[in-house]
Regions:
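Hydrophobic transmembrane alpha-helix bundles
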Residues: 5, 69-71, 176
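N-terminal capping/interface segment
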Residues: 1-20
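Short clusters of hydrophobic/aromatic residues that line enzyme substrate/ligand-binding pockets
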Residues: 23, 88, 207
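C-terminal segments of enzyme domains that contribute to small-molecule binding surfaces
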Residues: 94, 101-131, 163-214
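Short secondary-structure boundary/hinge segments and terminal tails
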Residues: 87, 141, 197-198
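Short, basic/polar amphipathic helix motif occurring as a linker/hinge flanking DNA-binding modules
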Residues: 84-90
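Structural signal for interior beta-strand "rungs" in well-ordered beta-sheet cores
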Residues: 16-83, 94, 99, 106-167
Length: 214
């Protein structure tokens, strides 16, 4: 568990933050050791600059798992960014309810509610990528720079482009299944620290052996 007072993982640089210690919106949940790096803006302003169209009226959540790496300028766009396609017009009449004599309760009619954004564990989201409402990203996935993610991403899959499409899987199906079974990100911190060599080696057998050690 990271101490609540610890914001910067590197003593020599303040462009990277532990995200869970700079977010205070109860509808945003971030797992241990997930980092955000921003060399343009203050990374402590992630909640304001990177989580957009996120309003209490929609009761929507952003859930990010453990050990994720989020690059500079990555954005999470929520439901209010999507003008409804059910209407005969794209104009936001319900949002401008006072101008048009509508009830305030009709505001949500202006957009299509696609749900929460869920990001798994050990996910890397590249520079200026955009993740849209209703998307779930699986554990170990990689989102390419400036990709626009409109659909769910399976675990350990690399996606890129506009809209984002699968480029390739990082590992074989059997290896992915084993990694999802091991869930190293849920291990005690001491065990993870002892297993870093195994994780960094890319050797799944080595990680399996580490999993069996006390």
């Amino acid at each position: 568990m990271i101490p609540q007072w610890k914001i910067y993982p590197r003593s020599q640089g303040h462009s990277t933050v532990y995200l869970q210690n700079v977010v205070d919106d109860p509808s945003i949940s971030v797992g241990d050791y997930t980092i955000y790096d921003d060399f343009v803006h203050d990374p402590r302003d992630f909640q304001r600059n990177n989580v957009l169209y996120h309003y209490p009226i929609n009761h929507e959540r952003l859930v990010i798992g453990k050990f994720c790496s989020i690059a500079c300028g990555a954005k999470f766009l929520f439901n209010s960014a999507n003008h409804t396609q059910r209407s005969l017009s794209t104009y936001i009449f319900p949002v401008l309810f006072e101008e048009w004599g509508l009830d305030v309760e009709r505001v949500p009619e202006a957009w299509d509610n696609k749900g929460d954004i869920i990001v798994g564990n050990d996910v890397w989201i590249g520079y200026e990528a955009v993740v849209l409402a209703g998307v779930a990203i699986g554990d170990g996935a990689i989102i390419g720079s400036r990709a626009v993610v409109t659909k769910d991403v399976p675990p350990y899959t690399i996606v890129g482009g506009v809209p984002a499409k699968a480029i390739r899987k990082r590992f074989s199906d059997s290896e992915v299944a084993r990694l999802l079974e091991l869930k190293w990100w849920d291990w005690p911190e001491e065990k993870i620290a002892k297993s870093i060599d195994a994780i960094q080696s890319g050797d799944l057998e080595k990680l399996k052996r580490a999993a069996n050690q006390a």
